[in-house]
């Protein structure tokens, strides 16, 4: 919906993201105008993202506006969680968010040193952790709290300790999501430090397989099935917009799981050449859901570690 702290700074975007401008966009959207970008065919929902959306001086007013005008629609807040360290702010956010409402918060490490090596903000580990505790305390029935882990080469070094920390401190979270990094924007400047293959990435996740089974729901976004161990397939969700993906030679015609796979992110092909992407020509022991966004229900994959 808005970017409250873009690269050029907030003062240059008041004409785009002020409360009055956003209010007009919300009402225009309600009238049927395409004032917000829509990425897929799922029923309308609102992503509040940024930057850090909760830093917007009118964040709570904007949240209230959307909830009032669209009382039945999902609102998903993507936040670093630090503002939620203020218990009153967490309480008001959950109270205004209503239902359906989701909050997704990234965590980078299981202690201050590892977390802040990535966040680059002293004190952010304690703030984000406290924010999650406040969300647990103040969330309303049916509201979902999600922890996101952005998988890069740097993040992978801290993954084992992070999973241990999450199990110890936040076993109650509704969802843990692993996102394979999209190499775009600033990430392109540091791709040599961040980038590794999907196969290497999924191997780090698979190493924590037994621990991850203890969470309520574990998901993997932006992964091609051929780069993921079969036993992890039930956790793979297809969330990439169509304009972001492509298909390699043979994948459309030879792969047994073409209809269940998200495809390949164009940036992955651009920056790595997609060396681990290839059609799967032999069937695997899996059960389908019929849901294009969550295609695999179960797998007898412990015996098939592709």
Where are these regions (language model features)?
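A short acidic, helix-capping loop that chelates divalent metal ions and anchors anionic groups
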Residues: 9-13, 111-119, 185-191
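Short connector loops/turns at beta-strand edges and beta->alpha or beta->beta junctions
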Residues: 1, 8, 108-110, 181-184
């Amino acid at each position: 919906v808005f970017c409250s702290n873009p690269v050029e700074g907030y003062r240059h975007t008041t004409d785009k993201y002020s409360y009055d401008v956003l209010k007009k966009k919300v009402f225009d959207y309600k009238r049927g105008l395409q004032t917000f970008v829509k990425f897929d065919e799922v029923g309308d929902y609102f992503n509040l993202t940024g930057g850090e959306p909760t830093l917007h001086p009118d964040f709570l007013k904007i949240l209230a506006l959307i909830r009032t005008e669209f009382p039945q629609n999902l609102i998903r807040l993507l936040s670093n969680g630090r503002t939620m360290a203020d218990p009153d702010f967490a309480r008001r956010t959950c109270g205004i968010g209503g239902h359906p409402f989701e909050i997704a918060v990234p965590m980078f490490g299981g202690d201050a040193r590892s977390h802040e090596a990535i966040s680059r903000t002293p004190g952010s580990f304690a703030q984000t952790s406290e924010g999650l505790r406040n969300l647990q305390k103040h969330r309303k029935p049916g509201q979902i709290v999600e922890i996101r882990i952005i998988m890069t080469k740097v993040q992978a070094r801290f993954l084992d300790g992070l999973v241990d920390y999450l199990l110890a401190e936040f076993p109650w979270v509704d969802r843990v999501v692993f996102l394979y990094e999209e190499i775009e924007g600033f990430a392109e400047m540091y791709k040599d430090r961040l980038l590794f293959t999907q196969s290497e990435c999924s191997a780090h996740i698979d190493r924590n397989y037994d621990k991850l089974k203890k969470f309520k729901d574990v998901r993997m976004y932006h992964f091609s099935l051929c780069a993921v161990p079969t036993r992890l397939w039930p956790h793979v969700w297809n969330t990439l917009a169509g304009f972001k993906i492509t298909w390699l030679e043979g994948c459309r015609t030879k792969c047994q799981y073409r209809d269940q796979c998200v495809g390949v992110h164009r940036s992955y092909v651009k920056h790595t050449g997609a060396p681990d992407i290839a059609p799967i020509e032999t069937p695997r022991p899996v059960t389908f859901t019929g849901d294009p966004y969550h295609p695999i229900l179960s797998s007898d994959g412990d015996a098939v570690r592709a």
